[in-house]
From Swiss-Prot:
Belongs to the KCNMB (TC 8.A.14.1) family. KCNMB2 subfamily. The ball and chain domain mediates the inactivation of KCNMA1. It occludes the conduction pathway of KCNMA1 channels, and comprises the pore-blocking ball domain (residues 1-17) and the chain domain (residues 20-45) linking it to the transmembrane segment. The ball domain is made up of a flexible N-terminus anchored at a well ordered loop-helix motif. The chain domain consists of a 4-turn helix with an unfolded linker at its C-terminus. It comes from Homo sapiens (Human). This is Calcium-activated potassium channel subunit beta-2. Keywords: Glycoprotein, Ion channel, Ion transport, Membrane, Transmembrane, Transmembrane helix, Transport. One of its GO terms (molecular function) is potassium channel regulator activity. Residues 1-45 are annotated as: Ball and chain. The lineage of its organism: Eukaryota, Metazoa, Chordata, Craniata, Vertebrata. One of its GO terms (biological process) is regulation of vasoconstriction. Disulfide bonds: none annotated.
Length: 235
């Protein structure tokens, strides 16, 4: 009797010991799984924040481009590319300007005014040529305005080089107003469609990247929940 009881006790002890070992293994697996889930959750949160930050930055870039580049592009009326032939290029007069010489320091100087008249091939009109749209805003009498500096001789030398280039290449492309309201043409568009495309390309890529990151994280979370439900059903 004593021997039988001792054997039973020993067997029960071994069974309890095995169960304790299995329980420890299971607890360890659950702990590892929780750690893995926590790490994945933190990584997913960071990925979502990165995607949202990319989208916010792209929206801010769209806003800045919209009030600067896109606005100037839409306001420009010189949209038709044409051919111009030089009629006359000459320095007519000088104008006063001011340049910065340091913090809260401005000095007066002068720049020569170059006037270039061209013949617009499509209409045969004699029109004044401007370098860019900004040239008209600075001084409507000058086709080309050099940067204001303290050395007038350098400005004069630069304008002479530009004038000689016009006389050398008398046939060139220019941009005119297709409506004919502006009696002038420009040589170079500051904001062409090509510049506009390249300026909007990178914010669009950033927006697409942010949306893709958020979508992939959400898809991963959905598939994870779906797999968990399937495993529960199979059990």
């Amino acid at each position: 009797m004593f021997i039988w009881t001792s054997g039973r006790t020993s067997s029960s002890y071994r069974h309890d010991e095995k169960r304790n070992i299995y329980q420890k293994i299971r607890d360890h697996d659950l702990l590892d799984k929780r750690k893995t889930v926590t790490a994945l959750k933190a990584g997913e949160d960071r990925a979502i924040l990165l995607g949202l930050a990319m989208m916010v930055c792209s929206i801010m870039m769209y806003f800045l481009l919209g009030i600067t580049l896109l606005r100037s592009y839409m306001q420009s009326v010189w949209t038709e590319e044409s051919q111009c032939t030089l009629l006359n290029a000459s320095i007519t007069e000088t104008f006063n300007c001011s340049f910065s010489c340091g913090p809260d320091c401005w000095k007066l100087s002068q720049y020569p005014c170059l006037q270039v008249y061209v013949n617009l091939t499509s209409s045969g009109e004699k029109l004044l040529l401007y370098h860019t749209e900004e040239t008209i805003k600075i001084n409507q009498k000058c086709s080309y305005i050099p940067k204001c500096g303290k050395n007038f001789e350098e400005s004069m030398s630069l304008v002479n080089v530009v004038m000689e280039n016009f006389r050398k290449y008398q046939h060139f492309s220019c941009y005119s107003d297709p409506e004919g309201n502006q009696k002038s043409v420009i040589l170079t568009k500051l904001y062409s469609s090509n510049v506009l495309f390249h300026s909007l390309f990178w914010p669009t890529c950033m927006m697409a990247g942010g949306v893709a990151i958020v979508a992939m994280v959400k898809l991963t979370q959905y598939l994870s929940l779906l797999c968990e439900r399937i495993q529960r059903i199979n059990r």
